[in-house]
């Protein structure tokens, strides 16, 4: 089965009840989760589109972006929702797509250095409204937390490395104001990430190591594996 065939037959799932989500998150985050559940209302957008595509950011040329291109080929009329988009930094084929970005995209520095926005990207993602009945989601840590109107299908490249493997992800930039702020906000960011992950019942991993990582981080078992395409052709 090709990725296109998988996407066109994908088992889209609706969001779980917030109380059920709260029951699934780690015990260490439950107190913070109850506060968020009480004081942070979730207002879903109204569905005005049949299908959409969501991805963290389109600023480079990598495997995750190839997957989004495959999604675009499967659903060529579907708009792509993403936090940041740099036409010169990613694959030129995206210029044919309808791409909708967050307000952060107006800051050119962040388009070229998305890691500098790490502490605020999850919150910006929460305000990314995707008004579609169905959404195919490609994520490494942000797009699964967009505000979806309808059902979604999650193709996970990895749980958020910037959160669970931050030193490895940041590399030489593991010191400074951004990593310090990231560590300070870590409990709130972990709650946001688990809340986003557990609102979707079905995940697909792109490799066996990612399947194991999803199980370790989110407690999701029996996640199916579907390998990503190796080229944009």
Q: Where in this protein do the model-derived segments appear?
A:
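Active-site donor-binding segments of glycosyltransferases and PAPS-dependent sulfotransferases
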Residues: 74-142
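Glycosyltransferases and closely related glycan-assembly transferases
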Residues: 43-45, 73, 125-134, 141-157, ...
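Membrane-proximal helix-turn-helix segments that form the acceptor-binding/catalytic region
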Residues: 171-203, 211
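Helix-loop-beta element that forms the nucleotide-linked donor phosphate-binding surface
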Residues: 204-206, 210-230
